[in-house]
């Protein structure tokens, strides 16, 4: 995989309204990049994305954002659901009735207290791994990634730098 040696890295963007706006403006571009990216070996892309993810996790504090917690419908594992309900002092049935629909937790997450998760140390796997950049087979998950780019500053910045590092010939 050939990477640009001298890359002009886009300015780090953390303003959520700007990220949403830029994601909408880059919508067609992101879909074209998605197709173009598939020419690369998945393992090579996974390694590069992992590096970018770690870079932006070090630069951006999730606990100052919590946009994912305010925006997403999240599906927990049954075992996690039991632990969450217990932590909140509720039965699973009461938690489901109060906080869920169609098997997913309604936003904003009921465990969100301001911008902090009240069960952060015991948060579910889906929350712990969000925005899922370091999971294998990045190029097979690009529809979800593009959705996350509009919500998460870490995903947005990593995705924009990925375009720059790969010298994507923008349309």
What are the language-model segments listed below?
Residues 1-171:
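Short loop/turn segments that flank or connect secondary-structure elements
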């Amino acid at each position: 995989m050939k990477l640009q040696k001298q890359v002009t890295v886009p300015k780090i963007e953390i303003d959520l309204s700007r990220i949403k706006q830029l994601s909408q403006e880059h919508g067609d571009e992101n879909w074209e990049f998605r197709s173009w990216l598939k020419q690369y070996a998945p393992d090579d892309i996974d390694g590069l994305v992992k590096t970018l993810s770690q870079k932006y996790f070090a630069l951006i504090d999730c606990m100052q954002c919590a946009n994912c917690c305010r925006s997403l419908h999240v599906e927990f594992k049954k075992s996690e659901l039991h632990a969450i309900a217990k932590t909140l002092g509720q039965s699973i049935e009461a938690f489901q009735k109060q906080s869920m629909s169609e098997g997913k937790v309604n936003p904003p997450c009921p465990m969100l207290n301001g911008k902090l998760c009240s069960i952060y140390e015991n948060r579910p796997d889906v929350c712990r791994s969000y925005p899922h950049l370091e999971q294998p087979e990045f190029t097979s998950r690009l529809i979800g990634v593009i959705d996350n780019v509009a919500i998460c500053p870490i995903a947005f910045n990593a995705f924009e730098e990925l375009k720059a590092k790969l010298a994507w010939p923008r349309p």
